[in-house]
């Protein structure tokens, strides 16, 4: 898939980091020809697929060769799977996450019928993973808080299905449930767990969890944004552009354990372009010898698409 760059700064329509990226792309030398910063191919680990057409355009413009997709506010397991059938670069994950109004009561009463639904979805062989499962998610605009134990019957059932079908699981678990998440990882050492946004943990907790749990993968979606709407502490950037050297050091020490993502949700072309531009800027700061693993290799291996 050949990436298409914005032809003018106004095409990107985004402030901050995305505009800086576009400005760099469009810098003109004396002979009048544009200098184009090469787009780094990457596999996006985190997309809420609300608009498949917008997603396809964004992937082409910003170098995403593949994307893990699951539902958003305007989609479902069925619509995600339909899109993936027509766009083979999309990697569908099945979700029964409790933020869904229809599913939350089942989580509250530990209803095994919901696990049977997930089992039926996975038995089709069409899905390459499970998630995003927001077991413990702080409240946000339009998103009610969820707070279910990673050791509870529902998460345990999900992990057992992941083991049965040999699939990775993406979980959103905040640091308030860190001990239970650690215990879950120990209980299912053979199940790869993708930690969405790395639980927004600080550096020392990221290092500790990765050292103690070899089946844990730290996913960086929303951590590379210049600003995060929930907390300025959630970004790993020290000034909106440069990654903290300590974070780069950890990522390059453990390159097989990190994934990149956009957390795209297709609210607007401008907001999504910011997210994709932030991934490109982050990847440029990683040394080339380890960049390919973080950008693509780790995720494609987890979902069975590695060459």
Predicted regions and their residues:
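Active-site gating/metal-coordination segments in enzymes
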Residues: 74-168, 225
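N-terminal carbohydrate-binding/catalytic regions of secreted carbohydrate-active enzymes
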Residues: 47-87
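Mid-to-C-terminal alpha-helical segments outside catalytic/metal-binding sites
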Residues: 4, 8, 14, 28, ...
């Amino acid at each position: 898939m050949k990436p298409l760059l914005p032809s003018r700064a106004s095409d990107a329509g985004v402030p901050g980091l995305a505009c800086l990226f576009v400005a760099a792309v469009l810098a003109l030398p004396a002979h009048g020809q544009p200098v184009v910063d090469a787009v780094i191919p990457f596999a996006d680990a985190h997309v809420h697929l609300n608009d498949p057409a917008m997603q396809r355009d964004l992937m082409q413009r910003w170098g995403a060769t593949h994307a893990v997709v699951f539902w958003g506010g305007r989609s479902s397991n069925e619509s995600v799977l339909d899109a993936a059938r027509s766009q083979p670069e999309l990697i569908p994950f099945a979700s029964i996450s409790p933020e869904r109004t229809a599913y939350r009561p089942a989580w509250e009463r530990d209803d095994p019928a919901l696990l049977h639904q997930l089992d039926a979805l996975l038995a089709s062989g069409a899905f390459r993973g499970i998630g995003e499962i927001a077991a413990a998610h702080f409240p946000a605009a339009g998103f009610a808080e969820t707070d279910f134990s990673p050791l509870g019957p529902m998460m345990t059932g999900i992990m057992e299905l992941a083991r049965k079908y040999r699939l990775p699981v993406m979980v959103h678990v905040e640091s308030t449930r860190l001990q239970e998440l650690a215990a879950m990882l120990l209980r299912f050492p053979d199940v790869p767990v993708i930690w969405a946004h790395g639980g927004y943990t600080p550096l020392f907790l990221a290092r500790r969890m990765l050292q103690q749990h070899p089946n844990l993968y730290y996913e960086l979606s929303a951590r590379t944004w210049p600003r995060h709407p929930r907390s300025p502490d959630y970004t790993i950037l020290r000034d909106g552009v440069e990654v903290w050297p300590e974070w780069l050091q950890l990522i390059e020490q453990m390159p097989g354990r990190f994934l990149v993502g956009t957390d795209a949700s297709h609210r607007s072309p401008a907001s999504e372009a910011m997210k994709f531009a932030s991934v490109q800027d982050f990847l440029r700061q990683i040394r080339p010898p380890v960049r390919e693993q973080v950008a693509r290799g780790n995720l494609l291996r987890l979902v069975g698409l590695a060459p």
